[in-house]
Swiss-Prot record:
Induction notes from the record: BMC production is induced by growth on 1,2-PD vitamin B12 medium.
Name of one Pfam family that matches: PDU_like
Note: Bacterial microcompartments (BMC) 100-200 nm in cross section are formed during aerobic growth on minimal 1,2-PD-B12 or anaerobic growth on 1,2-PD-tetrathionate medium, but not during aerobic growth on glucose, anerobic growth on glucose or pyruvate-tetrathionate. BMCs can constitute up to 10% of total cell protein.
Gene that encodes it: pduM
Annotated keywords: Bacterial microcompartment
Biological processes, Gene Ontology terms: positive regulation of organelle assembly; propanediol catabolic process
Protein name from the UniProt record: Bacterial microcompartment assembly protein PduM
Function: Plays an essential role in assembly and/or stability of the bacterial microcompartment (BMC) dedicated to 1,2-propanediol (1,2-PD) degradation. Overexpression impairs BMC formation.
Pathway connected to this protein: Polyol metabolism; 1,2-propanediol degradation
Native organism: Salmonella typhimurium (strain LT2 / SGSC1412 / ATCC 700720)
GO molecular function, one term: structural molecule activity
Record localization: Bacterial microcompartment
């Protein structure tokens, strides 16, 4: 193998890796269940799953892999794939915030606005100071400081306290 051929091979590999790093697969839960994961993980560096339902969120939170979609999401995380889950706003008051906040997942609402799941017992100014928009979901026993509430209002961040 001469130097030119080797150079072309290296350039092609670098090009494919760069395309993969910029690529996101957007799937529904049904499409994810039917997807070929090895091929999907080889072609995409991030995975966006649209409108996750509450039972699937519960399985993810409890690390259950009985459902094919939950198993594939856990596999994606194990492979280092960035996973973004889109949730319907009506689910926010009832999702398992503490358990889901521990997972390396990114959450958005159905409109693509960022969701921050805060599992701590106190939401302080520091927790909302760097956020620019979106929603912060806190569990029902979480104390929200006055400064955090003012900072959230100033930045158009909606605070959602669970029931």
């Amino acid at each position: 193998m001469n130097g030119e051929t080797l150079q072309r091979i290296v350039e092609e590999i670098v090009s494919r890796l760069h395309r993969r790093a910029q690529s996101t697969a957007t799937l529904s839960v049904t499409q994810l269940r039917d997807a070929d994961c090895p091929a999907l993980f080889c072609q995409h560096a991030s995975l966006r799953i649209l409108l996750i339902d509450l039972p699937l969120l519960g399985q993810l939170a409890d690390a259950e892999t009985g459902d094919a979609a939950a198993r594939k999401i856990h596999d994606a995380l194990a492979f280092g794939i960035r996973v973004q889950l889109s949730l319907h706003s009506q689910l926010l008051p009832v999702i398992p915030v503490k358990k889901l906040a521990r997972l390396p997942l990114v959450f958005t609402d159905e409109h693509g606005l960022p969701l921050v799941l805060h599992a701590g017992s106190v939401l302080s100014y520091r927790d909302v100071a760097l956020l620019s928009r979106g929603r912060v979901v806190v569990h029902r026993k979480c104390i929200v400081t006055a400064m955090a509430r003012d900072a959230a209002n100033a930045r158009n961040i909606q605070l959602i306290k669970q029931e």
